[in-house]
Regions:
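Gly/Ser/Thr-rich active-site loops/lids in small-molecule metabolic enzymes
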Residues: 152-160, 204-227
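ATP/NTP phosphate-donor binding region
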Residues: 1-60, 70, 105-108, 183, ...
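Catalytic core of DAGKc-family lipid kinases
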Residues: 6, 29, 78-82, 86-189
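Glycine-rich phosphate/pyrophosphate-binding beta-alpha loops
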Residues: 137, 141, 192-206, 269
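Short Gly/Thr/Asp-enriched flexible loops that form oxyanion-binding sites at enzyme active sites
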Residues: 68-81
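Glycine-rich beta-strand-to-loop/alpha-helix junction loops that act as flexible
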Residues: 9, 63-65, 86-88
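ATP/nucleoside-binding phosphotransfer catalytic cores, i.e., glycine-rich phosphate-binding loops
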Residues: 16, 183, 187, 210, ...
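Short conserved active-site loop signatures built around small residues
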Residues: 66, 191
């Protein structure tokens, strides 16, 4: 099988030595990938166009973080490649979600070759659409990601998000918006649309969500005060054993976002509402 490897030199855990280690380990198992060094989504999309023109299905290895993987699935055609991930990024939520503990573990799984079908979320804005692997965040979550400074993300890593959250807390926006699902309408201050169980690392936000089955879960924050989020953060850190009255969950295959709140997908800001979110079942196979 023809193999391609996307590597982001700007990823949080990238180094030339680490990349060389990956290539040597793959070559030991007769896997010799064509390497694409990429820094921007535009570069990723141009290489994905090459892969989309291949007549046979390829193996595409993504050595980067969640943002790099997101750009790859937005550039590829459905079913055009079997995907694999190596956790090179600042945040490697997808790797944790599918049970990849380290770069070495990811290589071993590639060699074994076990796969599962992966379903994605699809965000549709007025003039464009984006796929997402893990989650979409609307409201405060989207605003925090929007206001992260690129240099801060590079050098402070997760600390850059904490600084942005502090900025949003100081300039608090208490306004609400609505989401609409087949189950009804919900008024909320923020909403996380989950296609996976984890959020922001290894925090389990919705244990029933997984990219291996089609379907989304909306986690709606129905309180609009700062202390609401302090309680939610406490529950995330401690592993909640009880129902949080400020959260309302609804499972849905289609969700309409009303209003003009900020939106992020897989940790990258993409725009403002209104928007529509749906699922893209069995987009591709992924190495597990």
């Amino acid at each position: 099988m023809k193999t391609f490897l996307f590597v982001n030199p700007a990823a949080g855990h990238h180094s030339a030595q680490r990349l060389q280690f990956v290539l040597e380990r793959l070559r030991q198992h007769a896997i010799i990938p064509e390497v694409f060094q990429v820094r921007t989504p535009t570069e990723i999309y141009s290489y994905c166009d090459i892969i989309n023109k291949e007549h046979e299905q390829c193996l595409v290895i993504v050595a980067g973080g969640d943002g790099t993987f997101n750009a790859v699935v937005n550039g590829l055609n459905p079913g055009s490649a079997t995907l694999a991930v190596l956790p090179f990024g600042t945040s490697n939520v997808l790797a944790a979600e599918i049970g990849i503990k380290s770069i070495e573990d990811g290589i071993e799984k590639i060699v074994v070759g076990k796969t599962a079908y992966m379903s994605l979320g699809l965000l549709e804005l007025k003039d464009r659409s984006h796929r997402f692997v893990l989650m979409a965040g609307i409201g405060l979550d989207g605003a925090v990601v929007r206001d992260v400074m690129p240099l801060g993300k590079r050098f402070l890593r997760q600390g850059a998000y904490a600084l942005s959250a502090l900025k949003c807390a100081l300039a608090w926006d208490s306004s609400m918006f609505e989401i609409s699902t087949p189950e009804g309408d919900v008024t909320c201050h923020s909403v996380i649309i989950c296609n996976a169980s984890r959020y922001g690392g290894n925090f389990i936000l919705e244990s029933q969500s997984t990219p291996f089955t089609a379907g989304l879960t909306a986690i709606c924050v129905i309180g609009n005060q700062r202390r609401t989020y302090l309680r939610i953060a406490y529950d995330l850190f401690s592993g909640p054993k009880h129902h949080n009255r400020n959260l309302f969950k609804v499972a849905a295959s289609a969700i309409e976002i009303r209003g003009t709140k900020a939106i992020q997908i897989d940790g990258d800001f993409v725009g403002h509402g209104p928007a529509r979110i749906s699922t893209e079942p069995d987009f591709s196979q992924i190495i597990v």
